[in-house]
Regions:
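Long, contiguous interaction/targeting segments characteristic
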Residues: 1-113
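Ser/Thr-rich low-complexity repeats and stalk/linker segments
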Residues: 126-132, 136-138, 143-198
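A generic signature of intrinsically disordered, low-complexity regions enriched in glycine/proline
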Residues: 53, 115-118, 187
Length: 198
């Protein structure tokens, strides 16, 4: 095999190891996420139920993303992470809020959220942003989601209950991530960039 023309981390994160959170575990994660919501102030409103996404593990931490609507029509999005050695511990949570929701954007094919969780140092001092990306396909029949950097697949995730989570290098050497969803036969159904087009 010839050398790789693009030297970037591929499939760096473990695939999902657990079912989507439920019961007491979901309650624990919700408490951590809502504690982070307090820092956003009262203007966001009262959060509703949290929709959890598949877990991904990288660099010794497991990340579980989630979203929740508030009674003011905003969407909270963030993730809870924890150390993976033994029982979950050293919890941390990040959360943000947006007015941009899928119902207001019929042109969207995939509803995406993202959070930078680390960095990967490449050649010649270039740095990739290791980015957690979670989303909901807005097209029927999605079975697998992939993350691509300059048309190179760098991560993939089986769609679980119409949700997926990716963890991949982004913003590296001028290239940014595209997310694609595919049906069970490998036909592309939709593609979205993490960045708004000008």
């Amino acid at each position: 095999m010839p050398p790789e023309p693009r030297f970037v981390p591929r499939f760096a994160a473990e695939p999902p190891q657990e079912p989507l959170p439920y019961g007491r575990w979901a309650d624990t994660l919700r408490a951590e996420l809502l504690a982070a919501v307090l820092a956003l102030g009262d203007d966001v409103g009262e959060p509703g139920d949290v929709v959890w996404f598949p877990d991904r593990t990288w660099a010794g931490r497991t990340y579980v993303p989630g979203t929740a609507r508030t009674d003011r029509g905003l969407e909270l999005f963030g993730c809870v992470s924890y150390e993976v050695a033994g029982e979950p511990g050293a919890f941390a949570a990040t959360v943000d809020v947006t007015e941009e929701v899928a119902e207001a954007h019929p042109e969207w094919r995939i509803d995406l959220c993202d959070e930078v969780v680390g960095a990967w140092r490449g050649e010649l001092g270039k740095v990739a942003q290791m980015t957690l990306v979670w989303g909901v396909p807005l097209v029927e029949g999605a079975a697998v989601a992939t993350a691509e950097l300059a048309r190179l697949v760098v991560d993939q995730c089986t769609v679980m209950e119409n949700r997926f989570t990716l963890l991949a290098p982004d913003d590296y050497r001028g290239d940014t991530l595209d997310v694609r969803v595919w049906d069970e036969r490998g036909h592309e159904l939709a593609v979205e960039s993490l960045y708004e087009e000008d």
